[in-house]
Structures are given as structure tokens and as C-alpha cells.
Regions:
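Short alpha-helical segments that sit at the start of domains
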Residues: 1-24
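Short acidic, hydrophobic short linear motifs in intrinsically disordered regions
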Residues: 32-42, 70
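A short, conserved structural fragment
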Residues: 60-70
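Key DNA-contact positions within bacterial/archaeal DNA-binding proteins
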Residues: 50
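Short, hydrophobic-biased segments on the C-terminal half of alpha helices
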Residues: 56-57
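Amphipathic alpha-helical dimerization/coiled-coil segments
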Residues: 90-129
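Basic, amphipathic "hinge/linker" alpha-helix immediately C-terminal to the N-terminal HTH DNA-binding motif
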Residues: 70-88
Length: 129
């Protein structure tokens, strides 16, 4: 097989996607002006509370959230990732609904949003007005 025609496949990092989903969930809960609680995150992500605690400790160590007995809040870095994920999600929803005229498929949106970079999202925004 000629090396110029070799197909390159990219494998996403599930760990990075998990981090993004937690940050998006926290951002979304905060946006609704609700207290960010472990139980709320667990319910939103359909996972058990001990798993949420474990991930919050990890995110705290990565300085993406501030997690302590008082609660959970996003750091500046966590806020940036969370808001980017929400933006990607909303742009995809507008694309599906307004341009493609298909029913919004949240599972599909969730699968795509993790792979969008700023340039792609900006281009979609421009295309969608």
C-alpha cells in the first residue's frame, strides 16, 4: 500500500471526554442558578455519587474545579472548558434543527462536541449566522 494513501485514524481519549462532560454538567447546573451538588451532577450524568466524588477530587487536583465541603465551583480553566463545551453543543443543536431540519439528537451532539476545535466552531457559527 502506498504510504501517501494510508488512512490515519484518530482515537479519542475517553478520559478527556469524561473531564469535559463533568465540566459541562457543572457549567450547565450553574447556568440554571442551581447549587452544584454531587447528587445533581450524578443525576445529570447518570452515574453514582461515589464516582462523582472521585472525579471531583481529580478535577480539583487539575485545578479545573474547587471542590470542598462548601461545594463545587469551576476555576477559570474549568469555566473555559465548560463554556466551550456548551458552545459546541448549542452550535450543533442549531445546525441540526435550523439548517439540517433534523431532530436534535443529544447523544450524537455529545459524541461530536468533544472533537470540535475553536476554528471549526467559529466557522459553523459564521455559516449559521
Amino acid at each position: 500500500m502506498d504510504s501517501s494513501s494510508d488512512e490515519v485514524l484518530f482515537v479519542g481519549t475517553a478520559d478527556a471526554e469524561h473531564v469535559e462532560m463533568y465540566l459541562k454538567a457543572i457549567w450547565h447546573i450553574k447556568e440554571r442558578n442551581e447549587p452544584v451538588k454531587i447528587s445533581t451532577i450524578a443525576k445529570m450524568l447518570n452515574i453514582r455519587q461515589p464516582s462523582v466524588v472521585q472525579m471531583l477530587k481529580k478535577l480539583n487536583g487539575q485545578q479545573l474545579v474547587e471542590y470542598n465541603k462548601a461545594g463545587v465551583s469551576l476555576t477559570e480553566g474549568g469555566e473555559k472548558v465548560g463554556s466551550n463545551m456548551m458552545r459546541n453543543s448549542r452550535v450543533l443543536e442549531v445546525l441540526m434543527d435550523s439548517s439540517l431540519k433534523v431532530k436534535i439528537d443529544e447523544e450524537m451532539v455529545c459524541g461530536i462536541e468533544h472533537h470540535m476545535n475553536k476554528q471549526f466552531t467559529d466557522a459553523l457559527c459564521t455559516m449559521l449566522n
